């Protein structure tokens, strides 16, 4: 499929080929296009994509696309600019001025605590699709972005490089939420995300230790062993198990047992957390295939 030949008819054919609903694939097409347009601007130098899965067929099969979530990070050691409405408006105006594939874009901006939300509507072939971009300030300033390749699902020859929020920092944030909120966790998605990262990624345990220590200090959460013990006890906690099962059904994802999910998270977290509680240093690389540190 050449870049200048994408039509509504061809998108419908791809919908049948990929076994993805037309509405979902249309949303994926516009979100991917929006991402490429962002990467063509100078604003992209300060934006680190936080989503772990956003531009692949499995993501497009889901009922709704998650917002593109960026962290407003450093630009190669340059002085950090303030993340404010002026910056956000300039960003939104530039990406929405583009008319690639004859898509028309409109936007509005909203502030939500420290974050900015850019609500964008893309109109293509007389069809309108709402999309959302969330931009958050960088909290842990020692974090460094990772380079990732974005390969278009729709155009074989189209690709670009973008900055990805570092996996260890992202994972540490998930673990901090688990330990901070315990049974009051707002969404079980945090457990899902953490479990899948530990299943797929080799992780630098020292980085997790440093980031988790920073987050605890930043929000005045004292590392105590009773927190990890309480978390481990949730394997027989009916309330948490039912919440997990409800989440799995709603998301339509692989039905991994609650006990399996919690076991892997505790296995990873306990050595790091215990070292923090004892004010000891921690070294070790997590090996997902072995489910242990080396």
Label every PLM stretch briefly:
Residues 1-47, 55-68, 72-294:
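Structured mid-to-C-terminal alpha-helical surface segments
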